Structures are given as C-alpha cells and as structure tokens.
Amino acid sequence: MKKQNDFIFGVQYYRAPTPAPQSWASDLKNIKDNGFNTVKFWVQWGWTHRDENEFYFDDMDKLMDLAYENGLKVTLNVIFDVAPVWIFKKYPESKIVLANGSVVEPNAEGHRQIGGFPGTCYNHEKSFEARMEFLKRTVERYKDHPAMHMWDIWNEPEQCGPHRYAKSPELPCFCENCEKKFKEYLEAKYGTIDALNEKWGRCYRNFDDVQMPRDRFTFGDFIDFREFHLDTMTNEANSRIRLAKSIDKNHPVYLHVVPNTSSIFNGLVGVDDFELAKECDVFASTNFATPIWSVLTTSAGKGKTCYNVECHIGSGSTKMHQKQITIKDMAKDLLPQIGMGLRGFMFWQYRPEILGLESPAWGVTKLDGSIGSVGVAAKEFIGKLLPYTDEIANAPAPNPQIAVWKGRKHEIFSYCVNAELQSYAKAVESYVNAAYFNNYNCAVVNDERIIDGLDGVKLLILPMCYEFDSKLAAAVDTFVKNGGTVLCEAHLGGYNADTNRHSYTMPGLGLNELWGIEEEFTTSSYHLKTAVANADDLDTSEFNDDVKKAIDAYGLAGGKCFNIKTSFGFDVLGAERFAALKADDAEVIGTFSKFPCIVKKQHGKGNIIYCGTNLCEAVENDLESFEKFVVKAAEIAGVDRNSAATERGIHLDKVTDNIVIVHNDSDNTVEVALDGNYKALYADCDANGSYAMLPKSAEAFIKA
C-alpha cells in the first residue's frame, strides 16, 4: 500500500435509500464546488447482498463514476449491522441473545432505516462467512476504480446497538454459539479446569460444566466473559481488515470507532479501541469538540494518521432541528481537534436526512439541496486553512508528558462494583480535562502501554485503581524508579486481578512493601462524621439486602465528599473512599481530621503521590481545587506546559514550526503570548508576540 497522509475534508453522502438518484449529479458537483475533497458512500450488506447469490451494485457504480467525474476521492464505508433478510431466514439461530434470554429481532432504526439491525451474533460461523463474501465482492469490484481512496470496513463497532448501555440483564450475547466458543476461550486461557476453578472459586468437573456469567457479583468470571466478547470483536475487525488488504494493496484500510469514553460506548458492550487500531493503516472516530474524544482517538491510534470521519456539528432529529452554525462555531469545534492530532474531517452528512427520526437534520445543505449554515461555515473554514493542510497532514500528534490509565479489565471491574459506568467515565475524563484545560498534553493509556514502558511520560495518573495485576504493579514501580511520578487514588491493587481475590493489605500486590506505604484503616466517606455532603446523596439501590438493612438500622453519619487540608495552601475534596495512611519517610500533603490521607514519597528517581481517597469523584462538587491539585502533581513531576499561559481554559498546541492553535474555553478574554510574529488566520489580523483570545473561541496562527 502506498503511504498516504492526505488532509481529508469531506462529507458522508449516500446511505441508501437517500439521497434520491435524481440529486446525485448536481450534489456531487456542488460538493466539490463547496470546498470538499472527499466523499463517503455506505455499502450496506442488507441493501447490496439481497439474496444468497445476488448482489446489487448499480447505485454504487453510478456514484463512484460521478465522484470521479467531479474530482472527489471516495471512502467506501462497508456496513454490516444491517443484515439481509435471507440470513435470518436461513440461519434463525444467528440472532443475538441477551442475558435475560431475550432474542434480539432484526429491526429498522432511525440510523439504520433499511432494517436488519443490529445484525447477527459475531460468533455465528455461517453469517461470518456471508459477511466476508459480501466484503470480498465489494473490494474486488472497486479496488481499481480511479475514485477509490480508502476503505472504512466498520462503522462505529459495538456488540449490539439497541443495547449499548451497560445493564446486566441486557448484556449480549448468550446464544449457543457464544457459549460454545466461550468455553473454548476459557480452556485456551486457563489450560485446566482446576486453574479456572481456582480463579473463579468454583468446583466444575470440566469446561462443559461452566455456567455463563450473567451478572457482576463475583468479578473474575464476569470480566472473563466480557473480555471474550471484546476479543471476538477484535477478531472480527482483523478478519475484515486482512481480507480487504489481501485484495486491495493500494488503498488504506481502517475502521472508525465511537471512542470508548465509558459514558456512551464502553468496554462491556463495545470494543477495545487500542486493539482495533493495531492493524488499521490509519485510524478514525466519530468525534465531538470535548478533549476526551480526540485524546482517546489519537491514543488508541498512536503513531498513525487519525481522522474525525463523523463530525456531528449538524446533529438533530425530527423533535429537535439542528443548530445554525457560524464560522466561529466551526473553528471552535475543529481547530482544537487539529491541535490534539486529528488530520482531517468528514461531516455527517451532506444532505439532511429525510427518512425517519433523523430527519430533517444533520445536513451541510438545506432540505432543498442549497448550501446551509454548516456548509457556508465549512467552506470558509477550509478556504482559509487549505494552503496549510499538507503541512498539517504530515505533522505528528503532540507528545504527551501526562498519561491517564484506562484499562479494559478495570473498566469492567468498575461496573462490577458500581453497577454503572458513569462514575468511571467521569473519573478518566476529569483527569484528561484537568490536563488539557491547564495547557498540558496528555494521553490515555491501557495496560499494554504501561507494561511496554511510557516513553516521554513524566506523570502517570491511576484513577479509581482498585483492581490491578502484578504485571501492572511491576511496570508502575519501574516507571517510578526510573524517574516518573505516579498519582494514584485509593486502594491501589486492593483487588488482585491475578487471583480474583481481595488483597490482605493495601496497596496490594506487594506495593505496600516496595513503597513503604500502607493503608492503616479504611472506611466509606458515608461513615465520616465531618463529611461535607449529606448522606442522602447515597444511592443504595444496588447494595445487597444485608447492607441495606444495616444502613436502615445504624444510619449514616457522613456523605459523598469530605474536606482535605493540603500543604499546598488550598483544600481539596476527597470522595466515596477514605484511607488513613502510614508511610515512612514520606511527606504528608493531605490530612482529614488529623489523619494523613495523601502522601508524597520519593522512590528511586521518581515520586509517588498516594491518595487515600478518590479525588476524581468529587469533581462535580469542587472542580477548581481538583484541577489545582492535578497541576501541583504535574509540577512535582516536572511536566512542561505547552506555553507560558497558565489561565485555566487556555490550551496551546504547536502543530508545526509555523502553525499554532490556541483554544480558549474560559469565559474571559485572555492575552496569550506567542513565540514570534503570527497572523490570526480566521480573525485575519496580525498577532505580533501576543493575541487577545476571546471567550469560548479557537484560532489558528500562521507564522509571519
């Protein structure tokens, strides 16, 4: 495959059956005339593969030719989660089965109007073969077309679209195919039934005895089953990528995810973004303007060209029509994404949808096909940026000195403990935001990245790090000994992922001895008499009956948050968990009621900042102090800010030696220092040494 680092600026155009054929010729001409260089067409399994031996490509043939005639590059997005009718008739056992026994019947949705959604179980072999045949026919047909540019072989992968939110009774998939393959997976992982019994705490006689883990209460079995599904999705992705590459050796092959923020798409019913990115030639995502989306995309796609191939700035529905967009909106949305490492955009979609619940929204144009507010702003945006897009396209993403851990086992463990993922999602995002909006670059790292070493990282943050394993513990210890700083929250390694048992000491996994730090006693913040929030805040609905009875009998003295006095000159809130710490030769930097609960200790060449609470869970109560604490940790670690700007909300990215992007998320006008004389691209004025950034704005500066 030839190396291609194009800056794409395009639109999604065709999701059969819309737009109508009579609009195609004029629309594709107008797409080019309005500044776009790329167009995406959906090739849908159920629309194209209409019978077992019948394929319909007439619409795609015409669209590809029209794109070429208008000088547009084409990405073909191959869509599989709209399975053809004949599949379900021939293989009724291919349907997804939920934990509660419900069968997921094929259906039409607002975003999958042709039906067949969400497709078949990914462990059903015959439907897998049919998917691969459909992909093979598609790639063979268009690999040599002169308009062909890239293959997007999976659109927003997830295990079962109608059930994408983590709820135990609705988790997929428990069909006979999954049960058979899960048992094979366990045998390959554990080798013997005795090894599995030791880990799970069971007494099975053989792997055929294994009962499917339908809920979260004993952790290890549930984590194994969800990881099995994550690996199933990775295998599916790699099969598609490898097949496409084996047929077409000239065009990049990728897929695009909705980044696993844990709030929408997540590790229980989604995919492992880090694993899916590995075999892609480039990597991409559906993206929004908040930092977590771009950071997750470039972190998973580390070292690859990364794109936003579904820009949702024109979102809406029949109930809520889309917003009118200005060039200021466009710059504020897209420029920070470029700063964080994304190298092109495709808008969803060119014409507003007219079929179903997504109508009449999402359009770059108005309903009649004339240019709309999104299109006007997009044309002005790319018109100004175009002379610099080649330079931007080949610029690497920023090199982060802060890394925030997000491990897939630990994400699942967090669900096991909390019966929800929102608290975990907020934990990770809070640390990412604290770095970004205080003018630091950061990345999200998984277990593998930590174990392989964190080149260039000075501060490693471990949010809600209750579950840990020995490989991670050894890697973190090495990182600190070699000069890094780790900021960890309460009960590090309290649950040993190697044994599926709670540790006898915390931190666990021998870190208490290696680091000379011990949690002397622990309790919930809801038992602390001087907590600053009321006990009524506690949701007890997911507690077991015995705990509920005890709470009713004895009551609760505290609340979610409590105040910690720090040696930094400000107080910070802890939340949910409390541990009184004992640490020889350590500096106490935070106390609650005279008990040390945050300590800093040198270890080797580096530092440990050990928190006997979860700071991230108090963010909604005191964001300012939380972020001030993260900044102090960054200073201890020697992390470099991107510029001298220290005002909260200012973020500066030096994309190349000639191009700087500044984002001001604050409510104030801020004078930002620049390292020379620049031109403000969108304000169209000189910026000699400094520039007054307006509130809630972004600007690109080109060196004069």
Locate each region found by the language model.
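An acidic-aromatic substrate-binding cleft motif
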Residues: 1-22, 30-37
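The substrate-binding groove and active-site-proximal loops of carbohydrate-active enzymes
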Residues: 9-20, 42-58, 112-132, 171, ...
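Short, acidic/polar
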Residues: 18-33, 131-137, 264-276, 326-334, ...
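Aromatic-lined substrate-binding rim segments of carbohydrate-active enzymes
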Residues: 25-33, 38-106, 136-139, 240-247
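Polysaccharide-binding and catalytic clefts of secreted carbohydrate-active enzymes
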Residues: 99-282, 286, 295-296
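Hydrophobic targeting/anchoring helices
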Residues: 235, 254-430, 521, 550-552, ...
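A short, well-structured beta->alpha microelement
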Residues: 262-264, 434-453
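A conserved amphipathic helix/loop scaffold
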Residues: 326, 463-704
